Design a protein with these regions (language model features):
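N-terminus-biased detector of the onset of the functional/mature region
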Residues: 2-97
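Intrinsically disordered, low-complexity linker/tail regions enriched in Pro/Ser/Thr
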Residues: 1-19, 187, 194, 209-216
Length: 381
Protein backbone atom coordinates (compact mmCIF):
# COMPACT_ATOMS: atom_id res chain seq x y z
CA UNK A 1 0.00 0.00 0.00
CA UNK A 2 1.41 3.38 -1.02
CA UNK A 3 2.25 5.88 1.70
CA UNK A 4 -0.18 8.79 1.77
CA UNK A 5 1.81 12.03 1.73
CA UNK A 6 -0.04 15.08 3.07
CA UNK A 7 0.18 18.46 1.40
CA UNK A 8 3.44 20.06 2.54
CA UNK A 9 4.29 23.75 2.44
CA UNK A 10 7.15 25.85 3.77
CA UNK A 11 6.71 29.10 5.72
CA UNK A 12 8.69 32.21 4.73
CA UNK A 13 12.40 31.90 5.48
CA UNK A 14 12.51 28.10 5.25
CA UNK A 15 15.94 26.80 4.25
CA UNK A 16 16.64 23.34 2.75
CA UNK A 17 19.53 21.37 4.20
CA UNK A 18 21.67 21.83 1.10
CA UNK A 19 21.86 24.35 -1.73
CA UNK A 20 21.12 21.65 -4.30
CA UNK A 21 18.02 20.38 -2.46
CA UNK A 22 14.64 21.82 -3.40
CA UNK A 23 12.20 22.98 -0.73
CA UNK A 24 9.61 20.34 -1.66
CA UNK A 25 12.18 17.54 -1.49
CA UNK A 26 13.48 18.80 1.86
CA UNK A 27 9.96 18.96 3.31
CA UNK A 28 9.22 15.42 2.12
CA UNK A 29 12.47 13.99 3.51
CA UNK A 30 11.78 15.40 6.96
CA UNK A 31 8.14 14.34 6.86
CA UNK A 32 9.37 10.77 6.30
CA UNK A 33 12.05 11.11 8.99
CA UNK A 34 9.38 12.14 11.49
CA UNK A 35 7.72 8.77 10.97
CA UNK A 36 10.86 7.01 12.27
CA UNK A 37 11.73 6.27 15.88
CA UNK A 38 15.02 7.34 17.44
CA UNK A 39 16.29 3.76 17.19
CA UNK A 40 15.32 3.60 13.51
CA UNK A 41 17.06 6.89 12.73
CA UNK A 42 20.18 5.67 14.53
CA UNK A 43 20.10 2.49 12.44
CA UNK A 44 19.85 4.59 9.28
CA UNK A 45 22.90 6.58 10.36
CA UNK A 46 24.78 3.41 11.28
CA UNK A 47 24.11 1.90 7.86
CA UNK A 48 25.36 5.06 6.16
CA UNK A 49 28.59 4.96 8.17
CA UNK A 50 29.16 1.26 7.51
CA UNK A 51 28.51 1.74 3.79
CA UNK A 52 30.88 4.71 3.65
CA UNK A 53 33.62 2.78 5.43
CA UNK A 54 33.15 -0.25 3.17
CA UNK A 55 33.33 1.97 0.09
CA UNK A 56 36.50 3.59 1.45
CA UNK A 57 38.07 0.17 2.00
CA UNK A 58 37.28 -0.86 -1.57
CA UNK A 59 38.84 2.35 -2.92
CA UNK A 60 41.95 1.98 -0.77
CA UNK A 61 42.44 -1.61 -1.95
CA UNK A 62 42.54 -0.38 -5.54
CA UNK A 63 44.70 2.64 -4.78
CA UNK A 64 47.21 0.90 -2.49
CA UNK A 65 47.28 -2.66 -3.81
CA UNK A 66 51.05 -2.82 -3.29
CA UNK A 67 50.86 -2.47 0.52
CA UNK A 68 51.29 -5.39 2.89
CA UNK A 69 48.32 -6.16 5.17
CA UNK A 70 50.04 -4.40 8.06
CA UNK A 71 50.86 -1.34 5.94
CA UNK A 72 47.31 -1.26 4.60
CA UNK A 73 45.86 -1.37 8.13
CA UNK A 74 48.10 1.55 9.14
CA UNK A 75 47.09 3.52 6.02
CA UNK A 76 43.39 3.07 6.85
CA UNK A 77 43.96 4.14 10.45
CA UNK A 78 45.78 7.29 9.30
CA UNK A 79 43.00 8.15 6.85
CA UNK A 80 40.13 7.61 9.29
CA UNK A 81 41.69 8.97 12.47
CA UNK A 82 43.75 11.70 10.77
CA UNK A 83 45.49 13.90 13.39
CA UNK A 84 44.13 11.66 16.16
CA UNK A 85 45.92 8.55 14.87
CA UNK A 86 48.36 7.35 17.56
CA UNK A 87 51.99 6.94 16.54
CA UNK A 88 52.84 3.34 15.53
CA UNK A 89 49.17 2.32 15.89
CA UNK A 90 48.20 -0.61 13.68
CA UNK A 91 44.57 -1.74 13.95
CA UNK A 92 43.82 -5.22 15.12
CA UNK A 93 40.70 -7.05 14.08
CA UNK A 94 39.73 -7.42 10.44
CA UNK A 95 38.01 -5.42 7.73
CA UNK A 96 34.70 -6.72 9.07
CA UNK A 97 35.35 -5.03 12.42
CA UNK A 98 36.77 -1.89 10.79
CA UNK A 99 33.39 -0.89 9.37
CA UNK A 100 31.81 -0.72 12.84
CA UNK A 101 29.82 2.47 13.35
CA UNK A 102 29.72 4.96 16.24
CA UNK A 103 26.32 3.73 17.43
CA UNK A 104 27.74 0.26 18.17
CA UNK A 105 30.67 1.95 19.90
CA UNK A 106 28.19 3.85 22.09
CA UNK A 107 26.56 0.58 23.10
CA UNK A 108 29.91 -0.92 24.12
CA UNK A 109 30.94 2.18 26.07
CA UNK A 110 27.55 2.27 27.80
CA UNK A 111 28.30 -1.12 29.32
CA UNK A 112 31.65 0.13 30.66
CA UNK A 113 30.15 3.31 32.11
CA UNK A 114 27.39 1.36 33.82
CA UNK A 115 29.91 -1.07 35.30
CA UNK A 116 32.03 1.85 36.56
CA UNK A 117 28.94 3.73 37.85
CA UNK A 118 29.66 6.79 35.69
CA UNK A 119 26.69 8.92 34.59
CA UNK A 120 27.00 10.06 30.98
CA UNK A 121 25.18 11.13 27.86
CA UNK A 122 25.99 10.93 24.16
CA UNK A 123 25.97 14.21 22.27
CA UNK A 124 27.43 15.48 18.98
CA UNK A 125 26.88 13.79 15.64
CA UNK A 126 25.33 10.57 16.95
CA UNK A 127 22.70 12.49 18.91
CA UNK A 128 22.08 14.70 15.86
CA UNK A 129 21.40 11.56 13.81
CA UNK A 130 19.05 10.23 16.48
CA UNK A 131 16.94 13.38 16.56
CA UNK A 132 17.40 14.72 13.05
CA UNK A 133 18.96 14.03 9.69
CA UNK A 134 20.83 10.84 8.80
CA UNK A 135 24.52 11.33 8.04
CA UNK A 136 27.88 9.72 8.66
CA UNK A 137 29.93 10.63 11.70
CA UNK A 138 33.65 10.17 12.34
CA UNK A 139 33.61 9.78 16.10
CA UNK A 140 31.48 9.59 19.21
CA UNK A 141 31.12 12.48 21.67
CA UNK A 142 30.29 11.52 25.26
CA UNK A 143 30.01 13.77 28.30
CA UNK A 144 30.98 12.10 31.59
CA UNK A 145 29.99 13.20 35.09
CA UNK A 146 32.96 11.90 37.00
CA UNK A 147 35.66 13.15 39.33
CA UNK A 148 39.08 13.50 37.73
CA UNK A 149 40.43 11.34 40.54
CA UNK A 150 38.68 8.26 39.14
CA UNK A 151 39.85 8.81 35.56
CA UNK A 152 42.81 6.37 35.96
CA UNK A 153 40.41 3.61 37.01
CA UNK A 154 38.18 4.39 34.03
CA UNK A 155 41.20 4.37 31.72
CA UNK A 156 42.20 0.96 33.06
CA UNK A 157 38.72 -0.42 32.40
CA UNK A 158 38.80 0.99 28.87
CA UNK A 159 42.22 -0.51 28.18
CA UNK A 160 41.04 -3.90 29.39
CA UNK A 161 38.13 -3.59 26.94
CA UNK A 162 40.49 -3.00 24.01
CA UNK A 163 40.83 0.78 23.90
CA UNK A 164 43.95 2.87 23.46
CA UNK A 165 43.74 5.62 26.10
CA UNK A 166 46.40 8.37 25.91
CA UNK A 167 46.55 11.60 27.89
CA UNK A 168 45.28 10.28 31.23
CA UNK A 169 47.69 12.42 33.28
CA UNK A 170 46.65 15.56 31.37
CA UNK A 171 42.99 14.95 32.19
CA UNK A 172 43.66 14.10 35.84
CA UNK A 173 45.74 17.27 36.29
CA UNK A 174 43.10 19.45 34.64
CA UNK A 175 45.29 20.45 31.69
CA UNK A 176 42.80 18.71 29.40
CA UNK A 177 39.14 17.79 29.86
CA UNK A 178 38.82 15.22 27.06
CA UNK A 179 40.03 11.64 26.86
CA UNK A 180 40.43 10.78 23.18
CA UNK A 181 40.14 7.00 23.10
CA UNK A 182 40.43 4.62 20.15
CA UNK A 183 39.04 1.10 19.99
CA UNK A 184 42.03 -0.84 18.68
CA UNK A 185 40.21 -3.53 16.68
CA UNK A 186 37.65 -1.26 14.98
CA UNK A 187 39.49 2.06 14.33
CA UNK A 188 36.59 3.73 16.14
CA UNK A 189 37.25 6.87 18.17
CA UNK A 190 35.41 8.53 21.03
CA UNK A 191 35.91 11.84 22.80
CA UNK A 192 35.11 11.37 26.49
CA UNK A 193 34.55 14.87 27.86
CA UNK A 194 34.63 15.58 31.59
CA UNK A 195 31.59 17.72 32.37
CA UNK A 196 32.04 21.16 33.87
CA UNK A 197 30.62 21.69 37.35
CA UNK A 198 27.90 24.14 36.32
CA UNK A 199 24.16 24.46 36.83
CA UNK A 200 23.58 24.00 33.11
CA UNK A 201 25.62 20.79 32.95
CA UNK A 202 23.63 19.36 35.86
CA UNK A 203 20.45 20.39 34.07
CA UNK A 204 21.58 18.53 30.95
CA UNK A 205 22.34 15.42 32.97
CA UNK A 206 18.90 15.54 34.58
CA UNK A 207 17.28 15.89 31.14
CA UNK A 208 19.21 13.13 29.34
CA UNK A 209 17.03 10.52 27.69
CA UNK A 210 17.45 6.75 27.56
CA UNK A 211 16.69 4.94 24.31
CA UNK A 212 16.59 1.19 23.85
CA UNK A 213 18.51 0.10 20.76
CA UNK A 214 18.27 -3.66 21.23
CA UNK A 215 16.27 -5.95 23.47
CA UNK A 216 19.01 -5.71 26.09
CA UNK A 217 20.84 -2.43 25.58
CA UNK A 218 19.95 1.24 25.99
CA UNK A 219 22.10 4.33 25.66
CA UNK A 220 21.69 7.81 27.12
CA UNK A 221 21.44 10.74 24.74
CA UNK A 222 21.46 14.44 25.48
CA UNK A 223 17.96 15.84 25.18
CA UNK A 224 17.22 17.30 21.73
CA UNK A 225 16.82 20.77 23.23
CA UNK A 226 20.23 20.64 24.92
CA UNK A 227 21.75 19.29 21.73
CA UNK A 228 20.40 22.28 19.78
CA UNK A 229 21.77 24.77 22.33
CA UNK A 230 25.16 23.02 22.41
CA UNK A 231 25.46 22.86 18.64
CA UNK A 232 24.61 26.54 18.40
CA UNK A 233 27.41 27.20 20.90
CA UNK A 234 29.89 25.04 18.97
CA UNK A 235 28.81 26.56 15.67
CA UNK A 236 29.24 30.07 17.03
CA UNK A 237 32.82 29.26 18.02
CA UNK A 238 33.79 27.46 14.81
CA UNK A 239 31.44 29.02 12.22
CA UNK A 240 30.70 25.44 11.18
CA UNK A 241 28.01 24.83 8.57
CA UNK A 242 27.84 21.21 9.74
CA UNK A 243 26.70 22.35 13.19
CA UNK A 244 24.08 24.65 11.64
CA UNK A 245 22.80 21.86 9.41
CA UNK A 246 22.52 19.56 12.42
CA UNK A 247 20.55 22.22 14.31
CA UNK A 248 18.11 22.67 11.43
CA UNK A 249 17.81 18.90 11.08
CA UNK A 250 16.82 18.43 14.72
CA UNK A 251 14.30 21.30 14.61
CA UNK A 252 12.74 20.05 11.36
CA UNK A 253 12.50 16.44 12.51
CA UNK A 254 11.26 17.12 16.05
CA UNK A 255 8.98 20.15 15.48
CA UNK A 256 6.15 20.21 18.08
CA UNK A 257 7.86 17.71 20.38
CA UNK A 258 10.57 20.22 21.36
CA UNK A 259 10.43 22.49 24.40
CA UNK A 260 11.24 25.80 22.72
CA UNK A 261 10.73 27.72 25.95
CA UNK A 262 13.57 25.76 27.54
CA UNK A 263 15.87 26.64 24.63
CA UNK A 264 14.82 30.29 24.71
CA UNK A 265 15.53 30.43 28.46
CA UNK A 266 19.10 29.17 28.05
CA UNK A 267 20.02 30.80 24.73
CA UNK A 268 20.57 34.31 26.20
CA UNK A 269 23.00 32.82 28.75
CA UNK A 270 25.36 32.04 25.87
CA UNK A 271 24.50 35.03 23.66
CA UNK A 272 22.51 32.75 21.35
CA UNK A 273 19.06 34.37 21.37
CA UNK A 274 19.42 35.81 17.86
CA UNK A 275 20.83 32.67 16.25
CA UNK A 276 18.21 30.46 17.92
CA UNK A 277 15.48 32.69 16.51
CA UNK A 278 17.13 32.52 13.08
CA UNK A 279 17.29 28.72 13.32
CA UNK A 280 13.57 28.45 14.10
CA UNK A 281 12.81 30.57 11.02
CA UNK A 282 15.06 28.56 8.68
CA UNK A 283 13.72 25.27 10.06
CA UNK A 284 10.13 26.40 9.56
CA UNK A 285 9.19 26.08 13.25
CA UNK A 286 9.04 29.75 14.28
CA UNK A 287 5.24 29.66 14.58
CA UNK A 288 5.41 26.56 16.78
CA UNK A 289 7.97 28.23 19.05
CA UNK A 290 5.93 31.44 19.24
CA UNK A 291 2.75 29.60 20.15
CA UNK A 292 4.58 27.68 22.86
CA UNK A 293 5.75 31.00 24.29
CA UNK A 294 2.24 32.44 24.19
CA UNK A 295 0.83 29.36 25.93
CA UNK A 296 3.51 29.46 28.62
CA UNK A 297 3.15 33.19 29.30
CA UNK A 298 -0.66 33.27 29.31
CA UNK A 299 -1.01 32.81 33.11
CA UNK A 300 1.27 35.83 33.60
CA UNK A 301 -0.69 37.93 31.10
CA UNK A 302 -3.99 36.92 32.67
CA UNK A 303 -2.64 37.69 36.15
CA UNK A 304 -1.34 41.09 35.00
CA UNK A 305 -4.81 41.95 33.71
CA UNK A 306 -6.40 40.89 37.02
CA UNK A 307 -3.92 43.06 38.96
CA UNK A 308 -4.83 46.06 36.80
CA UNK A 309 -8.52 45.41 37.46
CA UNK A 310 -7.98 45.08 41.22
CA UNK A 311 -6.11 48.40 41.25
CA UNK A 312 -8.76 50.14 39.13
CA UNK A 313 -6.24 50.72 36.37
CA UNK A 314 -8.36 49.52 33.48
CA UNK A 315 -10.52 51.66 31.21
CA UNK A 316 -13.69 50.82 29.28
CA UNK A 317 -13.93 52.90 26.09
CA UNK A 318 -17.01 50.87 25.10
CA UNK A 319 -19.28 48.36 26.89
CA UNK A 320 -17.47 45.37 25.35
CA UNK A 321 -13.88 46.60 25.68
CA UNK A 322 -11.71 46.72 28.78
CA UNK A 323 -8.13 47.93 28.48
CA UNK A 324 -5.19 47.63 30.86
CA UNK A 325 -2.57 50.12 29.72
CA UNK A 326 0.87 49.27 31.10
CA UNK A 327 4.27 50.85 30.60
CA UNK A 328 5.28 48.50 27.80
CA UNK A 329 2.14 46.64 26.74
CA UNK A 330 -1.57 47.18 26.36
CA UNK A 331 -3.92 44.32 27.25
CA UNK A 332 -7.35 44.52 25.62
CA UNK A 333 -10.25 42.25 26.55
CA UNK A 334 -13.02 42.21 23.94
CA UNK A 335 -16.12 40.62 25.43
CA UNK A 336 -17.97 40.59 22.13
CA UNK A 337 -15.18 38.75 20.31
CA UNK A 338 -14.23 36.88 23.51
CA UNK A 339 -10.55 37.64 23.05
CA UNK A 340 -7.61 39.01 25.02
CA UNK A 341 -5.01 40.80 22.90
CA UNK A 342 -1.49 41.89 23.89
CA UNK A 343 -0.04 44.86 22.01
CA UNK A 344 3.54 46.15 22.27
CA UNK A 345 3.35 49.91 22.79
CA UNK A 346 6.71 50.72 21.21
CA UNK A 347 5.54 49.80 17.70
CA UNK A 348 1.80 49.16 18.13
CA UNK A 349 2.28 45.49 17.29
CA UNK A 350 0.04 42.58 18.28
CA UNK A 351 2.25 39.99 19.96
CA UNK A 352 -0.41 37.54 21.20
CA UNK A 353 -4.14 36.94 21.12
CA UNK A 354 -6.18 34.42 23.12
CA UNK A 355 -9.77 33.24 23.21
CA UNK A 356 -11.81 33.27 26.42
CA UNK A 357 -10.34 29.90 27.48
CA UNK A 358 -6.74 31.04 27.06
CA UNK A 359 -6.20 29.17 23.80
CA UNK A 360 -3.64 30.88 21.58
CA UNK A 361 -5.16 32.42 18.46
CA UNK A 362 -1.99 34.16 17.27
CA UNK A 363 1.52 34.79 18.56
CA UNK A 364 4.41 36.83 17.20
CA UNK A 365 6.79 37.84 20.00
CA UNK A 366 10.17 39.43 19.38
CA UNK A 367 13.25 38.52 21.42
CA UNK A 368 12.70 41.73 23.37
CA UNK A 369 9.10 40.72 24.12
CA UNK A 370 10.27 37.39 25.48
CA UNK A 371 12.79 39.07 27.76
CA UNK A 372 10.40 41.76 28.96
CA UNK A 373 7.65 39.29 29.81
CA UNK A 374 10.16 37.14 31.72
CA UNK A 375 10.93 40.23 33.79
CA UNK A 376 7.23 41.05 34.22
CA UNK A 377 6.55 37.49 35.37
CA UNK A 378 9.34 37.73 37.95
CA UNK A 379 7.91 41.00 39.32
CA UNK A 380 4.27 39.98 39.70
CA UNK A 381 4.69 36.43 40.96
Amino acid sequence: MATQIPSLSAPPGYRPQADDTGVETDLLCFYLLRQKTVAERLQMGAQLTRSARQFALNCFHQRFAQLTPRQFARKIAEAWLQEHCPADYVPGGSEVSWIQDSIQLAVELHQIFVAEDIPYYVTGGVAAIAYGESRTTQDLDVVLFVSRAVVPALASALEQAGFYVPGVDDVVSGRMRTLQVTQVDTISRADLIIADDTVYEQQKLARRQAYRLTNETSIYLASPEDLVVNKLRWGQQSQSQKQWRDVLGVLKAQQESLDYEYMHRWAPEFDLAAVLEQATVEAGVREIADRQWATAIYPTIHHAFEIAQARNRTTQPSPNLEIADGNLYTLTRDRAAQTLTVVAKTDDRDIARYDSQGTVLMASPSRQDRQQWREIAARIQ
